[in-house]
Amino acid sequence: MPDVAVIPRPVLLETTDGPPFVLTAATILVVDSAPELVAVGVLAADLLGRLSGRPVEVRYTEGGAPSVVRLRLSEDLPAGDEAYRLVVSEHRVDIDARSAAGLVRAVVTLRQTVSSLGDGTLTVPALRVEDHPRYAWRGLSIDVARHFFTVDDLKAIIGLLAHYKLNVLHLHLTDDQGWRVHLPSRPHLTRASAGTSVGGGPGGFYNPAQLAEIVVARAARGIRVVPEIDVPGHVNAATHAYGDLTPSGEPTDVYTGIEVGFSRLHDDLPATRPFLRDVFTDLAAMTPGEYVHIGGDEVLTMDHDKYARLVGYAASVVRDAGKKVVGWQEISSTPLEPGTVVQYWDINADPAPFVAAAQAGAHVLMSPGSRAYLDMKYDATTELGLEWAGHIELRDAYDWEPSTLIPGVPPESVIGVEAAVWTETLTDLGELTSMLLPRLAAVAEVAWTAPQDRDWDDFSGRVAQHAPFWDRVGFRWHASPQVSWPGPGSAPGAAF
């Protein structure tokens, strides 16, 4: 029997005696008729059909079929929306979950356990999996402002997130180099500032229909979108579009470099607050998720009281729109409403304000630059990426513990883990995935799996078996020297 190389590692995975389940032309997929279950069933049938090369029929009843994959909702599972149970025997696969999202996670596990025999037969070993995530927030932040990535690029990344049971796509939509989302109340933002990027490239933006397409793609895979408009710094794209946001009244020049900290909004200008209300109200209306990210990072030329007033105002607009507020760790130095999500990233900053905010009731999202910033170079020879937080090899992305990373932060305040990839040096999907893989799989396991169940040697063996999948779907990836990767022409194995 081939090794079972599931990532993230489940709470319980045990192989059982008995012959494997064989995916055949007679295999059907059975779900109840609830709309959300039908959507998961169609997704599962599509995944299995892609593996087998033949369609898998979705039905509401088994009807005596000899080979069945059954998806059901069940309360007989640990608490948590994403808990699931997967049981595989010779003639059937039974999947139970507390929610549609849990069924999606189970289908991913099933997909990762499918193996191909030498004659092309697809099998799943007899096994039992009981699983649920450690953290409810497991995400990836993608900077689409420095370089623009198309809807198709993002769909490919959404598929990758789902494959590693990540459930948040955080889109950094604005920065000095470009404004990437069309807002009905401020159409001049994309007219003036969408056509630029780092190095002078063409840029781009998402119109409302395209943003909705991204939202639909992620919803089918149990992933929520957290959109970010970064204020009160990183705003040169905004001040280039609207001169009334500058003291001179004149628009700023286009910026295509990679420096940070030079641009900001002005607390005392009459145009500033209407601008903030317009952009955050529009953004909240365009995305169905609970959260909107207000940025707040790297405002290096602004009086702190003025900074705090603008952060507070932006947060109030987001709350007025019915959303919860997320911001980078710098907002922890301002008055925060309980439940605000503060995202840790800067390993060089004084952690005291961040710790104080967590102790006062803020929720903590862990994205340490030295562990989870996947635009950092792997080593000094890496052609792409930056180095301000050091080099991050695969084991660096794996061997860290979110709950104890910052002394004084209450472990119960940590709601999740989010990797981030900034795109100053990344211009296309291939370059992006070469920095994400294999490190994204490592961060995903940190976010899903309890620390006592994580083991580097075990993980490195499992992740090696994922390389053929990355090759099959066309993802570029980094062959970390810390892993014994399979060579060309390896024996048949994982088919996922």
From Swiss-Prot:
It is an enzyme of class 3 (hydrolase). It catalyses: Hydrolysis of terminal non-reducing N-acetyl-D-hexosamine residues in N-acetyl-beta-D-hexosaminides. CDD domains: GH20_SpHex_like. GO terms for molecular function: beta-N-acetylhexosaminidase activity. It comes from Cellulomonas fimi. Optimum pH is 7.3-8.7 with 4'-nitrophenyl beta-N-acetyl-D-glucosaminide as substrate. Rapidly inactivated above pH 9.5 and stable from pH 6.0 to 9.5. GO terms for biological process: chitin catabolic process; glycosaminoglycan metabolic process; polysaccharide catabolic process. It comes from the Bacteria. The active site is at E298 (proton donor). Catalyzes the cleavage of beta-N-acetylglucosaminides and beta-N-acetylgalactosaminides. Also catalyzes the hydrolysis of N-acetylchitooligomers. May be involved in chitin degradation. It is not able to cleave beta-glucosides. This is Beta-N-acetylhexosaminidase. It holds the Pfam family Glyco_hydro_20b. The reaction mechanism involves an oxazolinium ion intermediate. Belongs to the glycosyl hydrolase 20 family. One of its GO terms (cellular component) is membrane. The gene is hex20. Pathway: Glycan degradation; chitin degradation.
